[in-house]
Amino acid sequence: MIALIQRVSQAKVDVDGVTIGAIDKGLLVLLGVEREDDLAKMEKLATKVMSYRVFSDENGKMNLNLEQAGGSLLVVSQFTLAADTGRGLRPSFSGAGTPDQAKTLYDAFVEFCKAKGVTTQTGEFAADMQVSLVNDGPVTFNLQV
C-alpha cells in the first residue's frame, strides 16, 4: 500500500466542476492499493500517515505530526501509484489492486482516520477528479508498507 503525502496549506478535489472535498492546513494523501494489500497493511499505513512528523515546531524543525499541528487530511484514490515503470515507455498496472479490493481498503483507510479523530475529506473513488493544492515547503513523502 502506498501513500504519497504532501504537506499543504490548502487542497481541494473537484468532480464535474463541483468541489467535493477541501482542507486548509494538513496533508493531501494520494492513496494507492497493490494486489497484496490487506486491512493490516491499511492500518499500519494510516497510522504512519497520521503519526509522521512533517510539520514544523517552534524551532522550524519537522517535529510535529498531523494532530499536533492541528491539520486535516484530504484522501484521494490514486491507482497509478502502483504502476511498474521499470521497463518500456508505458506503465504496467498489473501490480495494482483490483477495483473492489482498492475501494474496500480506500474506504477503510478513510474510516480508520476518522475514527482516530482526524478531520478527513475525500475525493470520489474511481472518478475523474481535478485536484488542486498549495504544497507547503514543498514537502512530499512517499510512504509504503
Curated annotation (Swiss-Prot):
Its main location: cytoplasm. InterPro entries: Daa-tRNA_deacyls_DTD, DTD-like_sf. A motif (Gly-cisPro motif, important for rejection of L-amino acids) lies at residues 137-138. It is found in: Cytoplasm. The keyword RNA-binding applies. Belongs to the DTD family. This is D-aminoacyl-tRNA deacylase.
